[in-house]
Amino acid sequence: MAPLGPTGPLPQSFLLKCLEQMRKVQADGTALQETLCATHQLCHPEELVLLGHALGIPQPPLSSCSSQALQLMGCLRQLHSGLFLYQGLLQALAGISPELAPTLDTLQLDTTDFAINIWQQMEDLGMAPAVPPTQGTMPAFTSAFQRRAGGVLVASNLQSFLELAYRALRHFAKP
């Protein structure tokens, strides 16, 4: 698919807001991971990867944001869809534990705000799809351990997602 729409730099105000929102989401995700590590000794996401596959924890694609195929419209759509997916995953973690509920709620709200910001920018550029993305099937965490392990994996995957998003948005900031 050929790149469509504007390919010039994104507004500085949008990029600064994205950077601020990314930092918030990363801090929230780190807080969730640190609490799960300290409280439940779930400290190494790499040890939980197989469980993540078994639970069906999806990871959003960011192929349009990679340096090989970077395109503004596709990347913004994938960023929005990815954040929307993480909203659903975070909702699926509800009930993880009483002490983590406030952190999870904050992470969910900050992720939602970031997704809304991306959507508004797509609308401003005339690039918003006619139909917003759908969430798809979310994993069913059937035990407290699965929710906690899922929390570690979702937070870890979200951090990786945000790192790639950050690099892509910085590229679009260049004149």
Swiss-Prot record:
User: Which residues of this chain are annotated as glycosylation sites?
Assistant: 134
Q: Which cysteines are joined by disulfide bonds?
A: 37-43, 65-75
Please classify the protein's predominant subcellular localization into one broad category.
Answer: secreted
Q: Which PROSITE patterns match?
A: INTERLEUKIN_6 (PS00254)
Lineage top rank: taxon: Eukaryota
Q: Which residues form a coiled coil?
A: none
Give the UniProt keywords, A-Z. Answer: Cytokine, Disulfide bond, Glycoprotein, Growth factor, Secreted
PTM annotation, UniProt: O-glycosylated.
Where would you find this protein in the cell?
Answer: Secreted
Gene Ontology process terms (BP): immune response; positive regulation of cell population proliferation; positive regulation of myeloid cell differentiation
The terms under GO molecular function for this entry are: cytokine activity; granulocyte colony-stimulating factor receptor binding; growth factor activity
Annotated Gene Ontology cellular component terms: extracellular space
**Which SUPFAM superfamilies does the entry mention?**
4-helical cytokines
Question: What's a Pfam family in this record?
Answer: GCSF
Briefly state the protein's biological role.
Granulocyte/macrophage colony-stimulating factors are cytokines that act in hematopoiesis by controlling the production, differentiation, and function of 2 related white cell populations of the blood, the granulocytes and the monocytes-macrophages. This CSF induces granulocytes.
Q: Which family does the entry's similarity section mention?
A: Belongs to the IL-6 superfamily.
Q: How does it assemble?
A: Monomer.
Q: This protein is called what?
A: Granulocyte colony-stimulating factor
User: What species is this protein from?
Assistant: Canis lupus familiaris
